From Swiss-Prot:
Family: Belongs to the UPF0761 family.
Record membrane topology: Multi-pass membrane protein
Major subcellular location class: membrane
Biological source species: Chlorobium luteolum (strain DSM 273 / BCRC 81028 / 2530) (Pelodictyon luteolum)
One GO CC term, this protein: plasma membrane
Designated name of the protein: UPF0761 membrane protein Plut_1323
Lineage: superkingdom: Bacteria
Record localization: Cell inner membrane
Pfam families in UniProt: Virul_fac_BrkB
């Protein structure tokens, strides 16, 4: 295999290893935050409030559409789109109830309509508070800033939804009318609900947290949440069609627990996506976990390099830096160069007349301690890899344990003695 192919394969293995390490560290961190934020309890609270607010919220949305004459004909299409695409399995029954409830709200007096608007604002405020708790934002929005955000969501949200439906309808019925374009139209229409879900969740994760959120993190959370949402829709539709536990128990009232259960699932998905977005940003800010303290960090790699040079000298082979880098291709090249520089400066190795490297002739009298005390103070901060094939035979676990015992014995001093300076001679 060509050297270039080896480099490509090594790069792929390294990236796969890095991805695996990321997921191994990310998943426990994510689960820990899910438990800490109690998203299932928050989802239940939001589901209950949504069940009480959904009719006022839809009434406000449709009322705003009625204000604009151009969008008034789209009202039934918006109703159908919301119910059939976001409440699976019970769309016909729920739409019939919603139409009656919403029709009743249109006959309410002005104070009743104002109450509906306040109820819708309270729901959005609760969502805002819940998401900001996930992001650990303890400073609430200013009243004017929060009201502006909620007002924008209630007014521009329906307009944007209706505009997208109107634009798509114009394109569907003027461009995609026959032949292959008609088939393409059908496929694109099937993707429209998922696309709107991704965009809605993306805006939710970007705008609602009172903290800067990276676009890529918000998009990742929105995509994962949309995938979970589609899986939940299919499972819920299957459950309603084949199991029908709620209908068997509650009869004609089954629509209420079914709707509540579906809203609960939806909020679990939304909050799960929010946790993913938060954890991606938190992991990036905190960086990788700090390695455990190891006074011999990097020493095994240094001994492996020194052994390689020593063995090559015994076989009459001259080594240079390129050969060392090729042998230790899994390691950080800058760390390897620093190791070689230290060994040369401390005379554990020397350069030959031909420019190669050779081990010192008195290695049999030099000790590990002689090597250790020559290490620079920042040597342990270098980026050293994990033990690989080139490290075989370099085993320092016994030395590490004895060194740890010496540290423990030497530092077995109560901290209070260091605070007040008493018994200083015992330190």
């Amino acid at each position: 295999m060509a050297p270039g192919s080896n480099g490509i394969m090594d790069g792929m293995h390294r990236r796969i290893g890095e991805a695996g390490a990321f997921f191994r560290s990310f998943v426990p961190f994510f689960l820990q935050n899910v438990r800490h934020d109690r998203i299932f309890l928050s989802a239940g609270s939001l589901a209950f409030q949504t069940l009480l607010s959904i009719v006022p919220l839809l009434a406000v949305v449709l009322s705003i559409l009625n204000v604009f004459a151009v969008f008034a004909p789209l009202q039934p299409y918006v109703e159908d789109f919301i119910v059939h695409n976001f409440v699976p399995g019970t769309g016909g029954m729920i739409r019939e109830y919603f139409s009656g409830f919403i029709g009743n709200t249109f006959t309410m007096p002005i104070f009743g309509a104002l109450f509906l608007f306040i109820v819708a604002l309270v729901l959005i405020s609760t969502v805002d508070h819940t998401l900001n708790e996930i992001w650990e934002v303890h400073s609430p929005r200013k009243v004017l800033q929060g009201f502006t955000l909620y007002w924008t969501v209630l007014t521009l949200g329906p307009v944007l939804l209706a505009t997208s439906l109107a634009a798509s309808s114009f394109v569907w019925y003027t461009v995609f009318t026959e032949g292959p374009l008609l088939e393409l139209k059908t496929r694109l229409l099937s993707l429209l609900p998922s696309t709107i879900t991704v965009l809605a969740l993306l805006l939710l994760y970007l705008l609602v947290p009172n903290r800067r959120v990276r676009f890529l993190h918000a998009l990742s959370g929105a995509l994962v949440a949309t995938l979970l949402f589609e899986v939940s829709k299919r499972w819920f539709a299957f459950y309603v069609a084949n199991v029908a536990t709620f209908e068997h128990i509650y009869g004609a009232l089954s629509v209420i627990p079914m709707l509540f259960f579906w809203i609960y699932l939806g909020w679990v998905v939304v909050l799960t996506g929010a946790e993913i977005v938060y954890c991606l940003g938190a992991r990036r800010l905190s960086g990788p976990a700090a390695p455990e303290f190891d006074p011999l960090r990097g020493v095994p790699l240094m001994l492996a390099v020194l052994r390689m040079v020593w063995r090559a000298g015994g076989e009459g082979v001259v080594l240079d830096m390129k050969k060392i880098l090729r042998e230790f291709h899994r390691e950080n090249p800058s760390s390897l160069r620093k190791i070689v520089d230290i060994l040369l400066e401390c005379r554990f190795m020397h350069l030959t007349a031909s420019g190669g490297m050779a081990a010192a002739s008195d290695l049999h009298v030099m000790t590990l301690y002689d090597l250790f005390i020559k290490l620079p103070p920042d040597f342990g901060a270098e980026d050293f890899g994990q033990a690989g094939p080139a490290w075989d035979g370099i085993e320092l676990q016994g030395v590490r344990e004895r060194l740890g015992a010496c540290f423990e014995e030497s530092m077995h001093v109560p901290l209070i003695q260091l605070m007040d300076g008493s018994n200083e001679g015992q330190v």
